[in-house]
């Protein structure tokens, strides 16, 4: 099992996430299976602790390449692990179907979400996620889905493009870049490749550091728009908490401020009781807290991990535990 050559990078914050999630046998959901690194770490910990029997891990991904890689990596645990093709926004239906087919209740002991684009996807030019190398302007995480980054770039009105760059990329020059995109469409025709978009950004943003930041923001914004990432994240957070059994935990690893703010805000709403309007002086909360925060501040990767895997530098992990029912 060890020593398998893989083009997928090591999973971010694997020891930390596993130590906080795995506390007994049960149903574990990896909503972002990727190459299977986190799932393998969870299964290994279940086996090491004597909890593998009676446990099931369901890994979800919409990327066919990732599913193939994960299937090979998890082959030794095929009795206890299933790789499912799908969007993690449908985690409730997917887990209910698969767990039900095995006679298990779809109540999870642990849920892991490792958000954003994988290092492998960034490294493959044909996926079109990176401005670092030329490739088609695709950016679909599910290659069978409709609607690419090129489709948005070539058809969206200027105001819509500016909104996408600002909302999803927090790009301060969103209007300038959007105007340049629409002007270029008229003068030179549609965009087809990542380097065409990168060259356009370089033509209107000045200063090496500012250019690099704008490139990252614009490509991030298009990727989020293509895959509707924030809308899907909102859905999976809500459904995920419903799937957790009392005492079950959810760990979410985010890589940019938009994701982290959403996760932080949602977790805060669960861990904070609602005592109603100020001054009423209620003895019981209107709505008690539904979870407790396992992590106060987000868990960050250490210097050694960042040196091995630079992507881990921006990672933040937040963990909550669903509270016991109090009826």
UniProtKB/Swiss-Prot annotation:
S-adenosyl-L-methionine binds at residues 36-38, 61, 88, 114, 121. It is found in: Cytoplasm. GO terms for biological process: rRNA base methylation. It is an enzyme of class 2 (transferase). GO terms for molecular function: rRNA (cytosine-N4-)-methyltransferase activity. Gene3D superfamilies: Putative methyltransferase TM0872, insert domain, Vaccinia Virus protein VP39. InterPro entries: RsmH (IPR002903), SAM-dep_MeTrfase_MraW_recog (IPR023397), SAM-dependent_MTases_sf (IPR029063). Its EC number is 2.1.1.199. Keywords: Cytoplasm, Methyltransferase, rRNA processing, S-adenosyl-L-methionine, Transferase. The keyword DNA damage does not apply. It catalyses: cytidine(1402) in 16S rRNA + S-adenosyl-L-methionine = N(4)-methylcytidine(1402) in 16S rRNA + S-adenosyl-L-homocysteine + H(+). GO terms for cellular component: cytoplasm. Belongs to the methyltransferase superfamily. RsmH family. Specifically methylates the N4 position of cytidine in position 1402 (C1402) of 16S rRNA. NCBIfam families: 16S rRNA (cytosine(1402)-N(4))-methyltransferase RsmH. PANTHER family: 12S RRNA N4-METHYLCYTIDINE METHYLTRANSFERASE, S-ADENOSYL-METHYLTRANSFERASE MRAW. This is Ribosomal RNA small subunit methyltransferase H.
């Amino acid at each position: 099992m060890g020593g398998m050559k893989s083009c997928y990078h090591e999973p971010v914050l694997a020891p930390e996430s596993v130590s906080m999630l795995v506390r007994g046998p049960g149903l574990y959901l990896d909503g972002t299976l990727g190459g299977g690194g986190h799932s393998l770490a969870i299964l290994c910990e279940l086996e090491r602790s004597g909890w593998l029997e009676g446990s099931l891990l369901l890994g979800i991904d919409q990327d066919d390449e990732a599913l193939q890689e994960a299937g090979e990596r998890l082959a030794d645990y095929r009795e206890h692990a299933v790789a499912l093709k799908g969007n993690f926004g449908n985690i409730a239906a997917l887990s209910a179907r698969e767990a039900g087919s095995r006679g298990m209740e779809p109540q999870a002991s642990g849920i892991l979400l490792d958000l954003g684009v994988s290092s492998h996807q960034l490294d493959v030019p044909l996926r079109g996620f990176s401005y670092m190398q030329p490739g088609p302007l695709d950016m679909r995480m599910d290659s069978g889905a409709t609607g690419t980054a090129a489709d948005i770039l070539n058809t969206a009105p200027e105001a819509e493009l500016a909104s996408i760059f600002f909302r999803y990329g927090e790009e301060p020059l969103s209007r300038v870049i959007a105007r340049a995109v629409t002007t270029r469409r008229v003068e030179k025709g549609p965009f087809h490749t990542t380097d065409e978009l990168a060259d356009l950004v370089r033509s209107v943003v000045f200063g090496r550091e500012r250019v690099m930041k704008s490139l990252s923001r614009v490509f991030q914004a298009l990727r989020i728009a293509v895959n509707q990432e924030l809308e899907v994240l909102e859905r999976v957070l809500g459904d995920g908490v419903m799937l957790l059994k009392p005492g079950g935990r959810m760990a979410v690893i985010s890589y940019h401020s938009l994701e982290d703010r959403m996760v932080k805000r949602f977790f805060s709403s669960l861990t904070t009781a609602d005592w109603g309007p100020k001054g009423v002086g209620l003895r019981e909360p209107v709505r008690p807290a539904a979870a407790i925060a396992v992590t106060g501040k987000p868990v960050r990767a250490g210097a050694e991990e960042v040196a091995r895997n630079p992507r881990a530098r921006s990672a933040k992990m937040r963990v909550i535990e669903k509270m016991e029912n109090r009826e």
